[in-house]
Structure formats: C-alpha cells, structure tokens
C-alpha cells in the first residue's frame, strides 16, 4: 500500500540494488513486466494496482490488448498494466558479493551453520551461539523461516512464521519464446499470494509458478518432508486457524494444483493458452516465511 514500509523498501531498494549491481559488475536486466487482466471482473483490481503504482512513484501505464500483444504476443487477456522498469537478476550472485564485501572489512565474520541459543540485552546486545558469544549495538533479524524464534529470544511479542511451499516448473527451452519477460496475473484480492506467473531468468531460462501450499515442516521443500512437532505447532496456532478459516477455499485450490500437474497447467493457460503439460519439467521449490499474527493477519 502507498506509504507502507514495504512500498518504501521496494522503491528505494530497487534503486540501490541497481546501483550495487552496476558497481559490482553483476549482470542484471531491466526487462519490464505486464500484469494481465483476463476478464472484465478483474479490471477494477487492475486499476487499483495501477493507481497504487503511480502513487508510489512507479512508472507504469495501462495498456490495450494491441499494445500487450506487441510486448507479449502469446498472452491472453483484455488489458494490462505495463511496468517497464521491472528487472531480473541472479540473487545468488548478489548474496555472494555481499558476503565478499562483509569479509573484506576488518573484524567482520560470517558464521554459517551456527545455531543461536540465546539473546541478552544490557547496554549492548549479546548473541549466544554454539561458537561463542558476540555483541553489538544492533541486531538485524534476517533469520527467515526461524525469524520468529530469534524474536522470541528477545522477549519481544511478534508474529509466528507459517511456512508455505511454492512449487515451480521450468519451461523446456523449445517453448521459451512464449514469454519474453515477466507475465503476472491480477492477484486474487481474496487470497494473500500472487498466483502462478511466468518469470524469465537472467540466464535466459523460463520458470512458471509458484503455487502456495502449507509446508508440513519449516524446511519442507518437498511434499514428503514432515516434521510432526513443527506441524503440530503450526496447526495449534490461533493465527493459523483464523487464516485457514478465511482462505480455506483458495487454499484447497492451491493444494489441488500441488498434486495435479493438469490443474497447475490450466492456471498457466489462463495467461498463455499455448502452454501444455509436456512443456514443463519440475523445478526446485521455495519456502515463503509468512508472518502471521494471532489475529490471523
């Protein structure tokens, strides 16, 4: 939403990311994206996206079907928002370069596979780990799937992390021409996720997805990965129960697409009718660390 911290982070962070990539000679591309309305009932939501973008200072425009097909010839739809300044980058390269810059400064350390066991606060913040104690003026919590555990160690009330697995398919090279850049649907206002979309990667490959299904473990990157204790903790959390009650219908659809490739393909065909099941091969899944308050928000 305009004025939110997320909006500020997107706008300022994008500019700083581009500058960092230029300085570090990391390959990136400003390729643009389209957000496509498939039917008349999606036009009000598309207009809202456009107005929010303009309010946030994002260069964007509503384009006709003719203009849309100039940008993405294989897309179905009746209208779209074009965001020409959207871009792509290999974030593993970005992370590796950040790590290099951190290590270059005297006294800095990066400790991988190191468990935090406690946090104390006096005049400074003391982090207790399996490899000793570390102290500083500030603690930046970037623990992802375990960020709520870190927050709890500071005795600060906060949200619980609910893990949602996002499953992807990679489009076979012979069909990469179906998507030139980035193609998104109009998000369902009744569901807190974006919906399946097409993403061209910086190496030229094309991926589609993700869906959004409850993972049965914090690191449940596959359907067969189950952690009974973590799952019980999720299912007994009041915030999750309220979230599930509100979005159960959409969630059931997401779960069905997880088990049915045909259903996944049908969702993709709303954007690109020419895509079919034979064009897709499984790609690695990701886990979204969704912060959920007791209220279900």
Located regions from the model:
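General small-molecule cofactor/ligand-binding pocket signal
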Residues: 61-63, 109-111, 281
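Helical element adjacent to the flavin cofactor pocket in flavoenzyme catalytic cores
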Residues: 81-138, 142, 146-149
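Flavin-dependent oxidoreductases
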Residues: 119-227
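A short, glycine/Asx- and small/polar-enriched loop/turn
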Residues: 41-45, 71-78, 120-126, 134, ...
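Flavin (FAD/FMN) cofactor-binding core of flavoprotein oxidoreductases
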Residues: 66-69, 161-164, 170, 174, ...
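Short beta-strand to alpha-helix junction loop
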Residues: 2-12, 36-46, 81-100, 111, ...
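Glycine-rich active-site loop/strand segments that organize a redox cofactor
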Residues: 1-13, 24-28, 215-250
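Dinucleotide-binding Rossmann-like beta1-alpha1 core, especially the glycine-rich loop
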Residues: 1-67, 77, 196, 217
